[in-house]
Amino acid sequence: NLVQFGKMIE
């Protein structure tokens, strides 16, 4: 999901 993706690029 988008939350996981956001954490990955941070």
Curated annotation (Swiss-Prot):
Q: Does the keyword Secreted apply?
A: yes
- This protein's major location comes to secreted
Record's Gene Ontology CC terms? extracellular region
Keyword vocabulary terms for this entry: Disulfide bond, Secreted
Protein modification: Contains 7 disulfide bonds.
| Glycosyltransferase found in the keyword field | no
Q: Where in the cell is it found?
A: Secreted
- Tissue specificity: Expressed by the venom gland.
Q: How does it assemble?
A: Heterotrimer of alpha, beta, and gamma chains; non-covalently linked.
Q: Which family does it belong to?
A: Belongs to the phospholipase A2 family. Group I subfamily. D49 sub-subfamily.
Query: What is the annotated role of this protein in its UniProt record?
Result: Heterotrimer: Snake venom phospholipase A2 (PLA2) heterotrimer that acts as a potent presynaptic neurotoxin by blocking synaptic transmission and synaptic vesicle recycling. Enzymatic activity is essential for the neurotoxic effects. May act by binding in a calcium-dependent fashion to neurotonal pentraxin-1 (NPTX1) and neurotonal pentraxin-2 (NPTX2), but not to neuronal pentraxin receptor (NPTXR). Also binds to taipoxin-associated calcium binding protein 49 (RCN2), a protein localized in the lumen of endoplasmic reticulum. Monomer (beta chain): Snake venom phospholipase A2 homolog that is neither toxic nor enzymatically active. Does not bind calcium.
Protein's recorded name? Neutral phospholipase A2 homolog cannitoxin beta chain 1
Q: Which organism is it from?
A: Oxyuranus scutellatus canni (Papuan taipan)
